[in-house]
Swiss-Prot record:
GO terms for cellular component: cytoplasm; plasma membrane. Oligomerizes as a right-handed, spiral filament on DNA at oriC. It comes from the Bacteria. This is Chromosomal replication initiator protein DnaA. Residues 1-85 are annotated as: Domain I, interacts with DnaA modulators. Residues 118-334 are annotated as: Domain III, AAA+ region. Plays an essential role in the initiation and regulation of chromosomal replication. ATP-DnaA binds to the origin of replication (oriC) to initiate formation of the DNA replication initiation complex once per cell cycle. Binds the DnaA box (a 9 base pair repeat at the origin) and separates the double-stranded (ds)DNA. Forms a right-handed helical filament on oriC DNA; dsDNA binds to the exterior of the filament while single-stranded (ss)DNA is stabiized in the filament's interior. Pfam families: Bac_DnaA, Bac_DnaA_C, DnaA_N. GO terms for biological process: DNA replication initiation; regulation of DNA replication. ATP binds at residues 162, 164-166.
Length: 456
């Protein structure tokens, strides 16, 4: 960020901190970062919509008045959700026109001056929590960052919403720029790529558009699945991909599904997406969820007991955003009610979220039924002592999913599968986990069954 804006913010924080409790300051203000300043307003990045709502309702005037006390000028305060910075052109567009553009594009992030790349400073390899669910994707991303266009090109990362795909993409960009400040790195969402193409066609600036995206060393495109069905965008990206790949430039793509499952994607693009390495990120297991919560608490300087984090990790399983959001919600609830953070308080704070999730409770019998139907077996076959491959492998998949999708203990899972020992369950879980890293057919099978279980 601009040096003057940095000094202004530091002095502002000192005033704000004196007007708030330590818990409230750490919860709401500490994670905020000023993005830009114009003649009339200051834009401030906030981590999520919940924090933005609280700041708008309770602390906006305090921040504005504190800034006025520092610089003797009253600015309009605009809180902007961090994730929106990637989807909207907040960093490159001023409030008025080109006159203020330079002021409003300042931010404390590593970017190449020649490009309009936007990388989140918080998304680095150091801040990424590694677990069984993302270890392969992390290793692949680091390998690409260490040797762009020499390891895997393209790198295609896929997984559900909020599992860390964008984090890894930004981390790759940061790592490359830190080791080569002259590298031209561009990160963009597929939606923004499409919108810029539309504007380029409308304004007859096709060559400028092509120069921007083809004259780079590293191109990172998030949510590439959204170009499916857009013929002109696919045509343009096909040629962009070819030119970059032929020039030995690195391409990194992310999606919510593997290339072969993206509908209405042209075959020529699908095949190119599969040229390099495809790495998936799965829903984090309990141990990884705990590690994520501890990391978040450390970064935000939050004091939360292990039993409370254990409660959150048990109840919130879907994705990292919800997990971290639940922690912030609990801290906020504690701050607003002036109560200590306990499991009981956590239960109160998350009751609405938990009640919605419990409406879709997954059981081992439901998993067994769906797996049995999928493989044309009977549930009794999964519980039997038969060891033929046509029974044993589906049984291992069912055990794996029982471990992933339920709260049942290993002994309980073993009991549900014909009274098997918990070590058998561990073996099944580890075998399927390992095979998922390289077996695309198994990846499709597990994904398909998981969807059926969630819809059941």
């Amino acid at each position: 960020m601009d040096a003057d804006l940095n000094k202004l913010w530091e002095k502002t924080l000192n005033i704000v901190k004196s007007e708030m409790s330590e818990v409230s300051f750490n919860t709401w203000i500490k994670s905020c970062e000023p993005i830009s300043i114009s003649d009339t307003s200051i834009k401030i990045s906030v981590p999520n919509s919940f924090t933005k709502d609280i700041l708008d309702k309770r602390y906006k005037s305090l921040v504005a008045n504190s800034i006025e006390a520092v610089c003797s000028k009253l600015y309009e305060i605009k809180f902007i959700i961090e994730s929106d910075l990637n989807n909207e052109d907040e960093l490159n567009n001023s409030d008025n026109s080109d006159k203020n553009r330079d002021k409003n594009s300042r931010r404390n992030i590593v970017v190449n001056d020649e490009m309009s790349s936007t990388l989140n400073p918080k998304y680095t390899f150091n801040s990424f929590v590694i677990g069984n669910s993302n270890r392969f994707a992390h290793a692949a991303s680091l390998a690409v960052a260490e040797a762009p266009a020499k390891a895997y090109n393209p790198l295609f990362i896929y997984g559900g919403v909020g599992l860390g795909k964008t984090h890894l993409m930004h981390a790759i960009g940061h790592y490359i720029l830190q080791n080569n400040t002259k590298a031209k790195v561009v990160y963009v969402s597929s939606e923004k790529f499409t919108n810029e193409l539309i504007n380029a066609i409308k304004d007859d600036k096709n060559e400028e558009f092509r120069k921007k995206y083809r004259n780079v060393d590293v191109l990172l495109i998030d949510d590439i699945q959204f170009i499916a069905g857009k013929e002109r965008t696919q045509e343009e990206f096909f040629h962009t991909f070819n030119e970059l790949h032929d020039a030995n430039k690195q391409i990194i793509l992310s999606s919510d599904r593997p290339p072969k499952e993206i509908p209405t994607l042209e075959d020529r693009l699908r095949s190119r997406f599969e040229w390099g390495l495809i790495a998936d990120i799965q829903v984090p297991d309990f141990e990884t969820r705990m590690a994520i919560l501890k990391k978040k608490a450390d970064v935000e300087n939050l004091k939360v007991a292990n039993e409370v984090m254990g409660y959150i990790a048990t109840k919130i399983k879907s994705n990292i955003r919800e997990l971290e959001g639940a922690l912030i919600r609990i801290i906020a609830y504690s701050s607003l009610t002036n109560r200590e953070v306990t499991v009981d308080l956590a239960s109160e704070a998350l009751k609405d979220i938990i009640s919605k999730k419990q409406g879709k409770h997954v059981t081992i019998p439901s998993i067994q039924e769906i797996v049995a139907n999928y493989f044309n077996l009977k549930i009794d076959d999964l519980k039997s002592q038969r060891r033929t491959r046509n029974v044993a492998y589906p049984r291992q998949i069912a055990m794996y999913l029982s471990r992933k999708l339920t709260d049942m203990s290993l002994p309980k899972i073993g009991e549900e599968f014909g009274g098997r020992d918990h070590t058998t369950v561990i073996h099944a879980y580890e075998k399927i986990s390992e095979n998922l890293k390289s077996d695309e057919s198994l990846q499709h099978t597990v994904s398909d069954i998981t969807k059926k279980v969630s819809q059941n």
